[in-house]
Regions:
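PLP-dependent amino-acid enzyme catalytic core
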Residues: 1-127
Length: 127
């Protein structure tokens, strides 16, 4: 088993963003970090595919702290953090998350069996 702490996840988010301008969400950053730890322990360079199936907009507080420093999100509303994240990464919040700006937690949408591809294409605006 591999464990990954919040500081490592935040560090990976910032490192990838600084190098590529890509805002990696915390869950995917955790998966990538766990893979890197496992690979280093095995002492092998095994290629992997890690799918990014989430959005940084589900984790605006974590994203703000990763990109702007620990404690940055304290006292700021989700609405403000979302606006700042949109400006920082140059990507508008997807419609699926826009109505959730005032909620503390954002549930994932439910997708019916056999409709995953269609749902992803719709969310990307290409269906």
């Amino acid at each position: 088993a591999v464990t990954v702490d919040d500081r490592r996840i935040s560090g990976l988010i910032l490192s990838i963003y600084d190098r590529t301008d890509y805002a990696l969400d915390p869950q995917t950053a955790g998966a990538l970090s766990a893979y890197e730890t496992w690979r280093d322990r095995q002492k092998i360079d095994l290629p992997a595919v890690i799918l990014n199936l989430d959005s940084p907009y589900r984790f605006v507080q974590t994203m703000a702290e990763a990109l702007r420093g620990r404690g940055y999100a304290r006292g700021r509303s989700r609405k403000v953090l979302i606006s700042e994240l949109e400006q920082e990464i140059g990507l508008a919040i997807p419609d699926i998350f826009s109505h959730m700006a005032e909620q503390d937690t954002i549930p994932l949408p439910t997708v019916k069996k056999g409709e995953l591809s269609k749902t992803i294409l719709e969310q990307l605006g290409i269906a």
